[in-house]
Amino acid sequence: MVYIFAIKSPVYGGQGAYLAYQIAEEVLKAGHQIKQIFFFQDGVNNANRFVNPANDEINLVQKWQHLAKSKKLALHLCISAAQRRGIVDQQTSTDSTNNLADMFILSGLGDFSRAVLTADRLLTF
């Protein structure tokens, strides 16, 4: 099966984003494909490279990055939601700084919609 994950849960402050990560791992272990992971609303905070949890806490940003790199997954971020919440890359930044974590890319709802049309399942967290 081909899955799309839509994540609107923040990186911390709830269990939604971590649950999405855990389910993504299990979906892949079961031999299914994840075509796209799309972060929107408060979920865009999962892509903030300045997230710095305590040493005894899970760094979910790093977990998403590792999963994307090791499984060659696309981590898409809603550009509108990201800009509203201060998540920017070099191109959208008003100065020379950016806080978009590696492996995440800014994209629009059109990319998400096209991916959904080709998937068997859409999971929202």
Curated annotation (Swiss-Prot):
GO terms for molecular function: sulfur carrier activity; sulfurtransferase activity. Its EC number is 2.8.1.-. One of its GO terms (biological process) is tRNA wobble position uridine thiolation. Gene3D superfamilies: DsrEFH-like. The keyword Cytoplasm applies. The active site is at 78 (cysteine persulfide intermediate). GO terms for cellular component: sulfurtransferase complex. Keywords: Cytoplasm, Transferase. InterPro entries: DsrEFH-like (IPR027396), Sulphur_relay_DsrE/F-like (IPR003787), Sulphur_relay_TusD/DsrE (IPR017463). It is found in: Cytoplasm. Its main location: cytoplasm. Transmembrane segments: none annotated. It comes from the Bacteria. Could be part of a sulfur-relay system. Belongs to the DsrE/TusD family. This is Sulfurtransferase TusD homolog. The lineage of its organism: Bacteria, Pseudomonadati, Pseudomonadota, Gammaproteobacteria, Pasteurellales.
